[in-house]
């Protein structure tokens, strides 16, 4: 992987990630394909929304179908027939989500398989081996996602263990002679001094990119923004920055305002299945009765297959009847909305008018523009 930074506009960055499998224009949003599929979508349909890179889930693909089945096909790209790059998370967040079902120790995490209850073990080394077999274009280190709220002592111990796991991840990645990219994950909760230690330690180890982890786990938006403003300037400018598990359209805009290049989230696909659709001026709940006889298109500014062919009334009908097609059409639209938003962001940076775009975006959705700490160092 090669990262090229073309230009900056304030803190916002415009660039691209170059892989053997293709080019990803940044800032970029990655649809989530947890089990080797973006729910309800073929790879061709996902590509048609404008997506250039997908996210797969190491933890879930390890449990089902498993490494051996994957290797029978070649790798995850061959298994799911996605031709572009794939980033896989390490399994750390899924382990964190298991709660009382898991025991975190220095060597790794012991837990019970949520599918069949058997005892299994996941370590930094094992995560690197699984992701190697998946053929991931971007591999994420194995870390502990520090929960919120956590006191300073817990966050410190968690961050320090994640740093030790980062070294072990790097070592095993290199032993496997993996030629793809490896990203470090910055932890430390909402504590700036701990984030400082994490960034410094990861940069000393050396990675191809750096993710900001442990955010969007329940903390106030002000804390997320504060941590991003504090951490971003410390990440090497020639490396991509990835905000994990984020988020709403506003979160993408605010992340870019603070120097983030990459995002992923289940929100556009999950919300689509629940009838919550993103449009130019906000969100539409398509199952609401007011859409029952609405013959207008979902979003007149959208060029997706759904908007070009179907009315709000039809989408309302499908949703009320729990028809699978409704979930598919909604997903096509929401993913296209996210990709159009990222394209608008990239164009605004190209034209040196990103902050004007930010104000236009918030005016469209009827929300105030969050403050930006202008005293923070620029991320360029």
From Swiss-Prot:
Residues 245-251, 269-273 are annotated as: RNA binding. Substrate binds at residues 89-93, 143, 187, 214. Binds 1 zinc ion per subunit. Pathway: tRNA modification; tRNA-queuosine biosynthesis. GO terms for cellular component: cytosol. The active site is at residues 89, 264. Keywords: Glycosyltransferase, Metal-binding, Queuosine biosynthesis, Transferase, tRNA processing, Zinc. Zn(2+) binds at residues 302, 304, 307, 333. It catalyses: 7-aminomethyl-7-carbaguanine + guanosine(34) in tRNA = 7-aminomethyl-7-carbaguanosine(34) in tRNA + guanine. It is an enzyme of class 2 (transferase). Its cofactor is Zn(2+). The keyword Nucleus does not apply. Coiled coil: none annotated. Belongs to the queuine tRNA-ribosyltransferase family. Catalyzes the base-exchange of a guanine (G) residue with the queuine precursor 7-aminomethyl-7-deazaguanine (PreQ1) at position 34 (anticodon wobble position) in tRNAs with GU(N) anticodons (tRNA-Asp, -Asn, -His and -Tyr). Catalysis occurs through a double-displacement mechanism. The nucleophile active site attacks the C1' of nucleotide 34 to detach the guanine base from the RNA, forming a covalent enzyme-RNA intermediate. The proton acceptor active site deprotonates the incoming PreQ1, allowing a nucleophilic attack on the C1' of the ribose to form the product. This is Queuine tRNA-ribosyltransferase. It comes from Proteus mirabilis (strain HI4320). The gene is tgt.
